[in-house]
From Swiss-Prot:
Gene3D superfamilies: Amidase signature (AS) domain. It comes from Rhodococcus erythropolis (Arthrobacter picolinophilus). One of its GO terms (molecular function) is catalytic activity. InterPro entries: Amidase, Amidase_dom, AS_sf. This is Uncharacterized protein in nthA 5'region.
Length: 199
């Protein structure tokens, strides 16, 4: 369910950041760039039609959630984050790291420029189902090239315990050493790179 939690946080939070914060969240430490914020605001207002379909969806859905529900969905999603974090923490008490495909499917060709809006958005957001939960829980994660499936590169995501980024990096490095260098385009063309079995 962590992906669904992320979905609400990303849409409501993303809409607020894009529409009200002009590219910035509020109450964050660090420097702000007022010129950039003003530029972002003017360009967003003048050229909203140039935004990608995915950005438009996030902006409209999030704005709707904030204005009609007063941010309650965002608050509920934020309140569920500790449960998602605890579920992964439980698994990580049994294992040093969790390993999964970076994408939930083998990458496909980019959609054509004239593809319908629903297909474009589905393809864009479908890729992040395995990575987005850790954007919410804050677990350190790393994607490393894992090989090829039917000639298409695939990634392996390694996720570890909070504040144990070093283990995630060590496991990633060990896998890279064991697997060998990722094939160059010439190697891929000659089909000399090791192939993985599709899952």
């Amino acid at each position: 369910h962590a992906f669904h939690i992320w979905n609400v946080i990303a849409t409501d939070g993303g809409a607020y950041q894009m529409l009200d914060g002009n590219g910035y969240g509020m109450n964050a430490e660090g420097l702000y760039d007022p010129e950039l914020m003003a530029h972002f605001a003017s360009r967003r207002i003048q050229h909203a039609d140039a935004l990608s379909e995915t950005v438009k969806l996030v902006a409209l859905t999030g704005h709707h959630g904030i204005t009609t529900l007063g941010g309650a969905s965002y608050g509920k999603a934020r309140n569920l984050v500790p449960l998602a974090r605890a579920a992964y923490d439980t698994a990580l008490r049994q294992f040093d790291v969790l390993v999964m495909p970076t994408l939930p499917y083998v990458a496909s060709e980019l959609p054509a420029k004239d593809v319908d809006r629903a297909t474009f958005i589905t393809k864009a957001l479908g890729m992040i189902a395995n990575t987005a939960p850790f954007d919410v829980t804050g677990h350190p994660s790393l994607s490393v090239p894992a090989g090829l499936v039917n000639g298409v590169p695939v990634g392996m995501m390694i996720t570890g315990r909070h504040f144990d980024d070093a283990t995630v990096l060590r496991v990633g490095r060990a896998f890279e050493k064991l697997r060998g260098a990722f094939p160059t385009p010439a190697e891929r063309a000659s089909n000399s790179a090791p192939q993985l079995s599709p899952a």
